[in-house]
């Protein structure tokens, strides 16, 4: 039986591997496994909670250097007096705000997710980009199309 969704997922996974975006490729392969096994009953839960769980894991990864002591408190405090660090803080606030808009947009208009994913994979493959941007990209899209 022909399954166009499975074909699209396989093509996106292949693009992920071709562009050395293993995070995207592995994620898609996991979803393919879920789709073709009895685990597919978990899709409603994955759709509802997946983004939240991903953000929690990402936040743990970002905060780990502070929690482990690799990033000393003195360095953290110094970031409030150095002008480059203040710019980094401002950009971090802006990007976090964009990411929040992106989550809202992706939740309200899931049809954009495929375009964001393809754009991210193409950016990695063609322009030596880094695959960090679907939420931020969605936030930028929300600015262009006027959605909050």
UniProtKB/Swiss-Prot annotation:
Keywords: Cell membrane, Membrane, Transmembrane, Transmembrane helix. Signal peptide: none annotated. Coiled coil: none annotated. It is a multi-pass membrane protein. GO terms for cellular component: plasma membrane. It is found in: Cell membrane. The keyword Chloroplast does not apply. It holds the Pfam family DUF441. InterPro entries: UPF0756_TM. The chain crosses the membrane at residues 14-34, 51-71, 86-106, 121-141. The keyword RNA-binding does not apply. Its main location: membrane. Belongs to the UPF0756 family. This is UPF0756 membrane protein Ent638_1667. It comes from Enterobacter sp. (strain 638).
């Amino acid at each position: 039986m022909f399954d166009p969704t499975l074909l699209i997922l396989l093509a996106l996974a292949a693009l992920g591997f071709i562009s050395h975006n293993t995070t995207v490729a592995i994620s898609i392969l996991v979803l393919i496994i879920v789709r073709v096994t009895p685990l597919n009953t978990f899709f409603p839960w994955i759709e509802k909670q997946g983004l939240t769980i991903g953000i929690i894991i990402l936040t743990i990864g970002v905060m780990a250097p502070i929690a482990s002591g690799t990033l000393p408190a003195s360095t953290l405090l110094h970031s409030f007096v150095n002008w480059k660090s203040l710019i980094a803080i401002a950009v971090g606030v802006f990007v976090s705000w964009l990411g929040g808009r992106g989550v809202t947009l992706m939740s309200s208009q899931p049809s954009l997710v495929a375009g964001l994913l393809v754009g991210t994979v193409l950016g990695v493959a063609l322009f030596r980009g880094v695959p960090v941007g679907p939420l931020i990209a969605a936030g930028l899209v929300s600015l262009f199309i006027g959605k909050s």
